[in-house]
Amino acid sequence: MARWVEPGELPGLVEVELAADGLFEQVGIVFPPGTTMIEEVTDPSAVLVEGEPPAGFALIGWVDGNLHLDQLAVHPSRMRQGIGGRLVAAVRDHATASGAPAVTLTTYRDVPWNAPWYARHGFSVLPEAEWGPELRALVEHERELGIEVAPRVVMRMVVAGRMMAD
């Protein structure tokens, strides 16, 4: 069951992130060197985890009034056990409880465990014309960091009965 991370568990999530990122080498994607996203977390209320000790995590924030899934990582040794799906469900539930109309994310379009996986879990591609200013800035920031080494898409899962007007 997904839960909020305990502050003392954050350092252990670095191994989860690095191991999950290593899978991308199978499809020719190598991330630029540097600190992991989880190492930059200062607020434990931005991280949901699954497992004891955590085998996966969801790092969340707010972008244009939507809950944004900054990263979802599951240790490869624990993949295909429903951990990612439970984390996405917990993110969706948190978005609903917080009054967010949707959950957004950016991901690789053609990596099987990225956009196609998210589509099976309720996300759909969000056309660029519908991106808000913060989402546009986030995508540009990812490009500057060198993350866009393969085609990427923005996806959204509507969690409220209808999207709120801008």
Regions of interest found by a model, annotated:
Residues 153-157:
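C-terminal edge-of-domain segments
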Residues 4-77, 88-89, 94, 125, ...:
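Acetyl-CoA-dependent GNAT
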Residues 85:
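Residues forming the Rossmann-fold NAD(P)(H) cofactor-binding site
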Residues 105-114, 131-136:
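Conserved beta-strand-loop-alpha-helix junction that forms the acyl-donor binding cleft
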Residues 95-108:
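Conserved GNAT acetyl-CoA-binding A-motif
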Residues 36-38, 139-146:
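Short, P/G- and charge-enriched loop/turn segments at secondary-structure junctions
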Residues 75-77, 81, 109-110:
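Active-site acidic-Proline motif in GNAT/NAT acetyltransferases
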Residues 118, 123:
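Conserved active-site tyrosine of GNAT-family acetyltransferases
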